[in-house]
């Protein structure tokens, strides 16, 4: 009985992937690639692009923010998908 219970606990942990956090790129357009672990419950990454006097600006991070008109936003839900 103990073996069965232990097996069920292990299977549950493996299937639920407890403690898993999404990883997203967070480097600005002109910087080397970096990524970070998102807060628990944050399951998406974003890539936000716009143009100003410096050229095309790219911002990356966790979540899927609301943006103003004229800003291109791409949201995705896999590891490091926002490059």
Swiss-Prot record:
Query: Which PROSITE patterns does the record associate with it?
Result: SNAKE_TOXIN
Iron listed as a keyword: no
A Pfam family cross-referenced in the UniProt record is Toxin_cobra-type
User: Which keywords does this Swiss-Prot/TrEMBL entry list?
Assistant: Acetylcholine receptor inhibiting toxin, Disulfide bond, Ion channel impairing toxin, Neurotoxin, Postsynaptic neurotoxin, Secreted, Signal, Toxin
> Where does the record place it?
Secreted
Name the principal localization, coarsely classed. secreted
Q: In which tissues is it expressed?
A: Expressed by the venom gland.
The answer to whether UniProt assigns keyword Disulfide bond to this entry is yes
State the Gene Ontology terms under molecular function. acetylcholine receptor inhibitor activity; ion channel regulator activity; toxin activity
Annotated S-S bridges: 24-45, 38-62, 64-75, 76-81
The signal peptide annotation in the UniProt record is 1-21
Q: Record's GO cellular component, any one? A: extracellular region
Q: What is this protein's function? A: Binds to muscle nicotinic acetylcholine receptor (nAChR) and inhibit acetylcholine from binding to the receptor, thereby impairing neuromuscular transmission.
Q: Which family does it belong to?
A: Belongs to the three-finger toxin family. Short-chain subfamily. Type I alpha-neurotoxin sub-subfamily.
Tell me the protein's name. Short neurotoxin OKI-17/NCA-06
